[in-house]
């Protein structure tokens, strides 16, 4: 079920403060965050976030196509190694 429109997008408050500080200073540092649940806003475009995937921090460079999605959508938590190979084929 989607979030109701009248509530607006959810973004952790500290994340907005960090982005605004970097905009004022003009620096382009990586913003380290554990907040996978935060929605990407238009002011985030051009910044690089280090999003935690449960094990390490994954760099996510935000562009215009990402606006409206969650930060966690771009930092996968599971690694797919492929389906199990057929053992009968290996014996030949």
From Swiss-Prot:
GO biological process: ribosomal small subunit assembly; translation
Pfam families (alphabetical): Ribosomal_S19 (PF00203)
A GO term for molecular function: structural constituent of ribosome
One GO CC annotation: cytoplasm
InterPro entries: Ribosomal_uS19, Ribosomal_uS19_bac-type, Ribosomal_uS19_CS, Ribosomal_uS19_SF
Keyword annotations of the record: Ribonucleoprotein, Ribosomal protein, RNA-binding, rRNA-binding
Family, per entry: Belongs to the universal ribosomal protein uS19 family.
HAMAP family: Ribosomal_uS19 (MF_00531)
Function, as annotated: Protein S19 forms a complex with S13 that binds strongly to the 16S ribosomal RNA.
Descriptive protein name: Small ribosomal subunit protein uS19
Gene: rpsS
